[in-house]
UniProtKB/Swiss-Prot annotation:
SUPFAM superfamilies: Cystine-knot cytokines. The keyword Lipid metabolism does not apply. Glycans are attached at N72, N133, N140. The gene is Tgfb3. The modification N5-methylglutamine is found at Q291. Disulfide bonds join C305-C314, C313-C376, C342-C407, C346-C409. Keywords: Cleavage on pair of basic residues, Disulfide bond, Extracellular matrix, Glycoprotein, Growth factor, Methylation, Mitogen, Secreted, Signal. Belongs to the TGF-beta family. SMART domains: TGFB. This is Transforming growth factor beta-3 proprotein.
Amino acid sequence: MHLQRALVVLALLNLATISLSLSTCTTLDFGHIKKKRVEAIRGQILSKLRLTSPPEPSVMTHVPYQVLALYNSTRELLEEMHGEREEGCTQETSESEYYAKEIHKFDMIQGLAEHNELAVCPKGITSKVFRFNVSSVEKNGTNLFRAEFRVLRVPNPSSKRTEQRIELFQILRPDEHIAKQRYIGGKNLPTRGTAEWLSFDVTDTVREWLLRRESNLGLEISIHCPCHTFQPNGDILENVHEVMEIKFKGVDNEDDHGRGDLGRLKKQKDHHNPHLILMMIPPHRLDSPGQGSQRKKRALDTNYCFRNLEENCCVRPLYIDFRQDLGWKWVHEPKGYYANFCSGPCPYLRSADTTHSTVLGLYNTLNPEASASPCCVPQDLEPLTILYYVGRTPKVEQLSNMVVKSCKCS
């Protein structure tokens, strides 16, 4: 008897396949979607900043050049990080991804030379040392989320070679006057060509500096095999030292000093100098019960929807203007951004050899009021960088998962 009932239900399911071929999720008109999306974004931004209400608009009308440079550098860095994740097909699953990060920029400082040079290899011809003072954020050191070392490679027209390998090291305290270093990463770079920013992940190194100030002896970029020049067959060329022919802005361009206006002109040049960008999670945004465990993982990115007129589930463009749509004047940059949204029917694909689809269809038939069919939801999201004021204090922060880049049926 039970077997006969099951067969009847499955027969009805086959007849109902066409009617179940589209998602049962409600299709909304664009105006309603935008209204809901705007309200969601309003709540997201305030939540990620741990604000109960929008800050009062600042009386400051001019954004300092250094702050604007930090904002632009952060945007560039996030774009690079997203590109690396695309190439590596990696996913970010940390719960700390959700909350906004405070952005701190530390320019290179001129420090005293440490006793860590090779006896026959003076620094300057085989390597460059970069030192930074990050003591101002030590009290929040355990909440470091990400640290990037950025340096601008500039072309060297007089270079004798077209390419050279460089390696980045963390300088360690010497042991019995023997130089010690910790390898961080390496790159093969052109010596000429156009200028380009180089980025290195130095999160572990900076975290160590923040926890133990005495360990902060700086970073060093060195050529791959210092103090040796190799012939094409691999033999060492005696008494000839390979020198670093890669040039860096702010380190090798000494001709910039002493020329022009020392005020605004110098400030404009400074943002091209070597620097660290630190992303910190403020303590008050952590350890909140009930938060984080419900956050979604990131997924792979796709630009398919912007290249094709897809009627089914896809990401749709939606521009949010902070002033017009949210009524906010406290966000200085950007003026708005493409938040996007997911929309479109999800085809209900069911085949005879798909047990999951059969069970899902059976459940949907027996529970007509339930929504067991897949809905079009965000799959991949990107962060947004904003510049805003709290009183007269400018802040640059990264807000995670604010831009919908792709969708999926789930």
